[in-house]
Amino acid sequence: MAVRSRRPWVSVALGLVLGFTAASWLIAPRVAELSEKRRRGSSLCSYYGRSATGPRADAQQLLPQPQSRPRLEQSPPPASHELPGPQQPEAAPGGPSFRSSPWQQPALLPQRRRGHTPEGATALPGAPAAKGEPEEEDGGAADPRKGGRPGSSHNGSGDGGAAVPTSGPGDFLYVGVMTAQKYLGSRALAAQRTWARFIPGRVEFFSSQQSPSAALGQPPPPLPVIALPGVDDSYPPQKKSFMMIKYMHDHYLDKYEWFMRADDDVYIKGDKLEEFLRSLNSSKPLYLGQTGLGNTEELGKLGLEPGENFCMGGPGMIFSREVLRRMVPHIGECLREMYTTHEDVEVGRCVRRFGGTQCVWSYEMQQLFHENYEHNRKGYIQDLHNSKIHAAITLHPNKRPAYQYRLHNYMLSRKISELRYRTIQLHRESALMSKLSNSEVSKEDQQLGRTPSFNHFQPRERNEVMEWEFLTGKLLYSAAENQPPRQSINSILRSALDDTVLQVMEMINENAKSRGRLIDFKEIQYGYRRVDPMHGVEYILDLLLLYKRHKGRKLTVPVRRHAYLQQPFSKPFFREVEELDVNRLVESINSGTQSFSVISNSLKILSSLQEAKDIGGHNEKKVHILVPLVGRYDIFLRFMENFESTCLIPKQNVKLVIILFSRDAGQESIKHIELIQEYQSRYPSAEMMLIPMKGEFSRGLGLEMASSQFDNDTLLLFCDVDLIFRGDFLQRCRDNTVQGQQVYYPIIFSQYDPKVTHMRNPPTEGDFVFSKETGFWRDYGYGITCIYKSDLLGAGGFDTSIQGWGLEDVDLYNKVILSGLRPFRSQEVGVVHIFHPVHCDPNLDPKQYKMCLGSKASTFASTMQLAELWLEKHLGVRDNRTLS
């Protein structure tokens, strides 16, 4: 009886199971068809649905697809927000029942499992479409890219509880760059060549529907450009921004975890951005960027309620995959209901309304997504030596390609410094492990792996002690021979100090958040600096800091700290400007009779060294020596004797050009002309040229007139009659002057008055004696110059309005710097400025007269010698120690 009583219940249960099964087979397809019709009810954005590239087997194996029927479209939205597109034809029988997209789809993702029902409009529960508006077109069940998975709650936990696959470095981030057709060859190309290469994913540029460069008839630049149909380059780019976001959603939603909308004038640090995003969960609805509320004039006019915000478009907006999944189906409604002309405000409103989130409220976002708020900003970030620049992930703006390349160059230089510092750390670890394992430490580890210390070098004599330079925030005090005792800190040292202090502050504030305090740098009170040639640069800095405590009782107090720092040198690197053809070089060496070879075991470089008399032969670049002159026949006679021994007898490849100024009838120039004719008759093959000029002496005018006689590839040497030089100087003039790049400005050794300096111990070595007693390096003079004619013209030439002595060389030097040429300055041991009495004309320009008096005072003797002479004359004290 008990068994029989159970049979009716078993029959009822079996009937329910069969009934539900039949309903799923008979009713579910009809429900899916009705849902499909409702999804097509919207006329907005339907043109931008997913594409159907023909009937696909994997699409047809899912559910039976109803045929598309003609239907009445809704009344179109206002023209200002309508997305135009051609009317789509009906789908072929048996084919997919959705409209085709004008974009070409990427490769299909793996087919979904049989039995999964297609996702509808992917509208969120609790965030439906507006009342009276049908849901946006989804693209149907045939498109697997939508990511439709039944049972997905869209609450940030992923797809129906399934684990989100971990993305690799190539499919992590998708960056869409908004640009315009006119910027494809400039801003967009600069972005592609700089930061876009370091993005862990894909970067594409979005422009208008018009093909790139079509109007110019030129091929488009090598950029991955997406032409958005129905979108133009008008500003504000609201439509372009929303359609770009929809393109990301339709094509790459399941391929990338994060999506970024960027401007073409932003700079993105790909490595820092990846590190930041890897720490977040892309399955949650996250909307990242610099939080904005509008400027002062726009407060209350953007349609934002209290507590609402948006992410500013300039530094970039970042969307998680879940935000796009929720928001994009409602983009049509967002476009129809806009309250402002700011596309970033409207995107933020759409995310907040349908994505279930808004731009994160975080103070750090203002630092990570950097917007330049400098006063009178010029379209670029001027100060790069800044902790804010180093901490930022995105930097905006860089309006010109040159600004983008400048910033990228700075970032690469910082990367190089970081890698070199890492090599130093590895050498230290290697040296430590060798010591702990009682093994021999390599020489490279011994040199580069030393711990920081000021005692690496131990002097054994008094003159081996390395002296420190004293510095303040603005001034440098030095005891070096070739430097003034007090000078302003130059730009190179200033940049080095700024970088050093910046690194120190980053080290101090490394754990500032956990410690609950922040320390800001105020200024350098004073400090010391020296360079150890074997180990690095050493600093002792007294820093004024500002201590800020933000945990517990808030406190802000100034503090002073001493910092003992060392910047160690890393391994040197060598680069060949021109690749060395070893086989050809060996043949030339073996065939030569006056050359020999040296093989360097460390560098493996085979080089040829020739005898000195072969240097500067006729196969070298010809040097045109230009000498302006007025009177001073005896000095000119000495110059020609030196020119004969240095150039004429060894047959140097040079040409001498004398610019001879004469007053009155030119009677004083007869001797000069006869002397030149005598040398021409003595050396017929030598090239010498005389350019006579009348009027007051003007060095700039004479050199400008003489240089105009030659073509642009001529190497010019601006010389003075007071100089004597050797052949090695001419070779360095050739080597250190690079056409279009570099100008050689040798620092000349100038003799003191021999009546003062040699009154007790006259020299026997000749004029090329370099010591404190015989002369000084004329580091303030720029008159002796090696430059190409084309570079002289490019810099602007001499100021021919300057009359008399001085200033024309300083003016040209400034022009060379401003023209972008690189001045090469160094002490030149092959040239000596022979002493001559200086006469300063009181009728000179006041600035020229002051410079002339300063030059005259510096030529008498050294400070120590003048002091001895004064003591001997006035006090009868005689001390020969300084002259010994």
UniProtKB/Swiss-Prot annotation:
It is an enzyme of class 2 (transferase). GO terms for biological process: chondroitin sulfate proteoglycan biosynthetic process. Residues 29-884 are lumenal. The keyword rRNA-binding does not apply. Its EC number is 2.4.1.175, 2.4.1.226. Its cofactor is Co(2+); Mn(2+); Cd(2+). A divalent metal cation binds at residues 722, 836. Pfam families: CHGN. The chain crosses the membrane at residues 8-28. The keyword Signal does not apply. Residues 1-7 are cytoplasmic. It is found in: Golgi apparatus, Golgi stack membrane. InterPro entries: Chond_GalNAc (IPR008428), CS_glycosyltransferase (IPR051227), Nucleotide-diphossugar_trans (IPR029044). Has both beta-1,3-glucuronic acid and beta-1,4-N-acetylgalactosamine transferase activity. Transfers glucuronic acid (GlcUA) from UDP-GlcUA and N-acetylgalactosamine (GalNAc) from UDP-GalNAc to the non-reducing end of the elongating chondroitin polymer. Specific activity is much reduced compared to CHSY1. Belongs to the chondroitin N-acetylgalactosaminyltransferase family. This is Chondroitin sulfate synthase 3.
